Amino acid sequence: MDFSASISPIGPPEGVWEAIRSVDLSAYPDPECLELREAICRYISTPSRQISIERVLAGNGSTEIFHLLTRVYLANQGTALLLTPTYGEYDGACRLTGAEILNLEADLTGDFRWDIRAATRIIETKKPELVIVCNPNNPTGVYLVRQEIGYLADAAKVAGSLLVVDEAYLSFVEDPWNSLELLDRSEVMLVRSMTKDYAQTALRLGYALASEEVVSRLREYQPDWSVNGLAQKAGVSALADTGYLHRAREAVFSAKNFLSDELRALGLEVPRSEANFILAKVGDAAKWRSLLLAKGMVVRDCTSFGMPEYIRVGIRPLADCQLLAAAMAEVAQAALAE
C-alpha cells in the first residue's frame, strides 16, 4: 500500500476512462493542446477575471515545465533561488543547466516556515533569473499567505526575476486564498498538477499560467506532441467533472485529521500540513520506512530532504489510513520494547 505518493485518494474521475477509450491511438495528438488549454481557461476563468488561452502552457507533468523554465532562463550561467527543503526536481533541473543555485532553508527546528524578508533581500541583491517556491510546500505542508507571496513578487519585479509558484498541492488546502490574482503581474508564473489533483499519475499532465510572453518563450523550447493524446483527453474530461475536487478534498480532510490524531496519540510529532500529506517525526526515518515496508506499507523517508528524523505520509482513503495507523502503532510499540 503506497503512502509515499500524494495524489487524490478517490481515484480518477469516472468519465476519464471513457475519454481515454475514445482516443485514436493511430493519430498524432494535437501539438498545441488547444482543446485542453481551452478547458483549463474555462475552468479557472471567472466573470471578473478571464484567462486567455495564450497564457496557458500544458506540459507532460509539471516537471516538464520546470525543465523548460531552467533551459530558457538559466542557460547562460543564470542563477536560481530555491526555498528549501522542497521538491528535488527543481534543483535537478537547475543543475542540468550549470546554473548557480541559491538555497534559503526553512527553520527545521521550529514551524518549517521561511524567513520571507531574508528571501526578498537575496532576490534584490543577487537578482536570480528564477525564484521557485512550492506552495503548499513539499514535504513540509507549509502554506504561504497572500502577503508573503506578494513580498516575493515585489522583490522579483525589482530584480527582474521570474517568481514561479508551484501549486501542485493547492487543491487540498482547506482555506486557500485566490492566487489567480497574481496573474496580473508579469513577473509571476503559477504551475499546477492535474496528475495529483485527479489521480492521473500514469498519464503525466500539468499546466502553467503566466504572461503571454513567458508562455511563448517556453513553448519555443517544448517538443511537439509533448503531451500525449490520452493525457489531453483525460484532462478535458477531468475538468468537466465539476464536483470531483470537492469529493476529493472531503476525503483528504477526513482521513488526514484521523491519521494526524492517531499518530499524535502514539507520541509522534505531526506538524500542521496544508497539503494532502503529513510529516511524522519518528527519529530514524530509514528504519521506520523499512519496518513499515515489511508490513506492506510504503512511506517516504525524508532523509533526501535533509530531514532524516521524518517520514512523509500521503493521504489515502480512510480505510487505508486506519491500516497504516495500526501498523505504525505496532512499530512504535516495538521501538519502546527495544
Residue ranges and their predicted role:
Residues 1-31, 39, 127:
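N-terminal "arm"/small-domain region of PLP-dependent enzymes with the aminotransferase-like
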Residues 2, 191, 269-273, 302-303:
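Short beta-strand
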Residues 13, 187-264, 268-271:
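PLP-dependent aminotransferase class I/II
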Residues 14-15, 284-291, 320-323:
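Short, conserved charged micro-motifs
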Residues 253, 261-295, 311:
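Conserved PLP-binding catalytic core of the aspartate aminotransferase-like
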Residues 294-295, 304-338:
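PLP-dependent enzyme catalytic core of the Aspartate aminotransferase-like
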